[in-house]
Design a protein with these regions (language model features):
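Catalytic core of nucleotidyl cyclases, primarily class III adenylyl/guanylyl cyclases
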Residues: 24-55, 69-114, 142
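Cytosolic regulatory/linker segments at or just downstream of nucleotide-handling modules
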Residues: 95, 119, 127-171
């Protein structure tokens, strides 16, 4: 978008969209970790992995909905020429949180672990798979009783060399 539209227009739209995405995440008990190259990285903490996955899925569906509204109803001022889109990835499991870099805990707060690695690898594939929302196999297993889950494809990942099934969630 930055190549076709003014940086100011894109930045203004992204900041507005980011606020909407953050609100959706927080509405379902999540926390935003960081924003990397247009990606919002969020996490949910707790002991009930199934319940946490459900909250994350609800947030993802809400983000998908507000993004459609944002694009379709003119909040993105170039909506007639270019649809504002986002891709969403859900990956769950145990990770670490804490400060990285800097001395004495003065670094940046972040999350680390297999679920994060999986999410970043899947994020690179979402558009190629023709989907807007991809759910990692282990997360889909946590969601299958609460959502309509459809298998997309099995993909090889660095941390899943034998492959991992991917799914999407129906609206």
């Amino acid at each position: 978008l930055m190549q076709k539209y003014s940086p100011e227009d894109v930045q203004q739209a992204f900041v507005h969209w980011q606020r909407m995405a953050t609100t959706a995440i927080e509405d379902f008990g999540g926390q935003v970790d960081k924003i990397v190259a247009g990606s919002v990285v969020a996490f949910w903490k707790g002991d009930d992995e199934k319940k946490l996955a459900q909250k994350a899925a609800h947030a993802a569906l809400q983000i998908r909905e507000v993004t459609e509204d944002f694009s379709e109803h003119g909040e993105w001022k170039h909506h007639q020429e270019a649809h504002w889109e986002c891709t969403l990835v859900l990956s769950s499991g145990f990770g670490l949180t804490g400060s990285v870099g800097g001395e004495g805990g003065q670094g940046s707060f972040t999350i680390l672990g297999d679920p994060v690695t999986t999410a970043f690898q899947l994020e690179k594939l979402v558009s190629k798979l023709g989907e807007q929302l991809i759910v990692a196999g282990p997360t889909a297993q946590l969601l299958k009783d609460s959502f309509v889950i459809t298998k997309v494809i099995k993909v090889k990942l660095k941390n899943a060399p034998d492959g991992m099934d991917t799914y999407t969630i129906a609206s």
